[in-house]
UniProtKB/Swiss-Prot annotation:
The modification ADP-ribosylarginine is found at R97. Keywords: 4Fe-4S, ADP-ribosylation, ATP-binding, Iron, Iron-sulfur, Metal-binding, Nitrogen fixation, Nucleotide-binding, Oxidoreductase. This is Nitrogenase iron protein. Belongs to the NifH/BchL/ChlL family. Pfam families: Fer4_NifH (PF00142). The reversible ADP-ribosylation of Arg-97 inactivates the nitrogenase reductase and regulates nitrogenase activity. The keyword Magnesium does not apply. Its EC number is 1.18.6.1. ATP binds at G8, K9, G10, G11, I12, G13, K14, S15.
């Protein structure tokens, strides 16, 4: 079983990318569980046909400790399994703790056991804040390979670099490695070349360039992943391509984060910042 975490700055399209990738893997007959680690609890909605799933923390608050696996894990598109860790009430407590509680509960209830025949577990993690709780999947060895969703926008690249600092810190003590950058295009000038160069400087690869396409929004309005909505459109091919690239990936590295000056120089070189 491959344990994958998807990180990236808020609003970059992590949840959309994760769910569409999982749909792509499902069409390749891979058995996948998705664990949403974002307090917004929107990491599985498209796989569940638009249903808002009750989160692990909400279930615990309402039912107490007496929880069965089927209470927190729902079947989604392509025989995937869907879990949302959820978060605390706004203004109270730490969302990172919710991730820790959820993953421990899934382990105790046997969600990862061999009889489940999982090929992958995907953690979709809020990524601007590399605080201890959100870093938990990489810190405690729950995730072994990380993909960072980014774009050619400055803040997305800053966030990617910061996440690499977190990976580097925990790679020394555990087995976590960076599998690559996924460029979720924002149609920025020179975007593909810039992310390829950023990946090179980080010691990794741009594993896939996902073009920007309104079919993603059309599918979301229909509460589906692109592949489930219309598997003949070019964007469905893009997500299948990304799923295949992850499935075949063999490049796992400890990243070499950039100093802020190097990152700014990269942005200057590609015309995103004025000298």
């Amino acid at each position: 079983m491959r344990k994958v975490a998807i990180y990236g700055k808020g609003g970059i399209g992590k949840s959309t990318t994760t769910q569409n990738t999982v749909a792509g893997l499902a069409t390749m007959d891979r058995k996948v569980m998705v664990v949403g680690c974002d307090p917004k609890a929107d990491s599985t909605r498209l796989l569940l046909g638009g249903l808002a799933q009750k989160s692990v923390l909400d279930t615990l608050r309402e039912e107490g400790e007496d929880v069965e696996l089927e209470d927190i894990r729902k079947p989604g598109f392509g025989e995937s399994w869907c879990v949302e860790s959820g978060g605390p009430e706004p203004g109270v407590g730490c969302a990172g703790r919710g991730i820790i509680t959820s993953i421990n509960m899934l382990e105790n209830l046997g969600a990862y056991e061999e009889g489940e025949n999982l090929d992958y577990v995907f953690y979709d993690v809020l990524g601007d804040v590399v605080c201890g709780g959100f870093a938990m999947p990489i810190r405690d060895g729950k995730a072994e390979e990380i993909y960072i969703v980014c774009s050619g926008e400055m803040m997305a690249m800053y966030a990617a670099n910061n996440i690499c600092k977190g990976i580097m810190k925990y790679a020394e003590s555990g087995g976590v490695r960076l599998g690559g950058l996924i460029c979720n295009s924002r149609n920025v000038d020179n975007e593909k070349e810039m992310i390829e160069e950023l990946a090179k400087k980080l010691g990794t690869q741009m594993i896939y360039f996902v073009p920007r396409d309104n079919d993603v929004q059309r599918a979301e309005i229909n509460r589906k992943t692109v592949i489930e909505w219309d598997d003949t459109v070019p964007q469905a091919d893009a997500y299948r391509g990304l799923a295949e690239a992850i499935d075949k990936n063999e490049m796992f590295v400890v990243p070499t984060p950039l100093e802020i000056e190097e990152l700014e120089q990269l942005l200057l070189d590609y015309g995103l910042m004025e000298a």
